[in-house]
Amino acid sequence: MKKVLALVVAAAMGLSSAAFAADAVSTTQAPAATHSTAAKTTHHKKHHKAAAKPAAEQKAQAAKKHKKAEAKPAAAQKAQAAKKHKKVAAKPAAPQKAQAAKKHHKAAAKPAAQKAQAAKKHHKTTKHQAAKPTAQPAA
């Protein structure tokens, strides 16, 4: 893992040959010394390299990000906003009027049906009362 990081950092700086040489030296030193001292020496060397190199990479990335933010998303946002406003003004306004007209016609038709149902219920109650007294004396 440490070797991979060293290679990536070295490749970014353009010193791949120096990185390979540093890796070769660190691998040969590690078996000769104890693990703790080898880890410390290689660790310090990599920290110095990492501290020097990512600073240049970060500056380059920041410059790229600023250029992209100014160029592409600004134009895309304006186009999207224009599209949204056109859709809201054109399409939903006409269907809403048609739906409102349909709802009003249906509302006028429904109360008439309710009156008919109420009239039917009243007639049924009178028919049942008239039918019950005639059925009792016959039984």
Curated annotation (Swiss-Prot):
Residues 41-51, 118-130 have a biased composition (Basic residues). It holds the Pfam family Asr. Keywords: Periplasm, Signal. GO terms for cellular component: periplasmic space. Its main location: periplasm. Residues 27-139 are annotated as: Disordered. It is found in: Periplasm. It comes from the Bacteria. Residues 22-80 form a propeptide. The keyword Signal applies. Residues 27-40, 52-61, 90-99 have a biased composition (Low complexity). Proteolytic processing gives rise to the active protein. Required for growth and/or survival at acidic conditions. Belongs to the Asr family. This is Acid shock protein. It comes from Klebsiella pneumoniae. The lineage of its organism: Bacteria, Pseudomonadati, Pseudomonadota, Gammaproteobacteria, Enterobacterales.
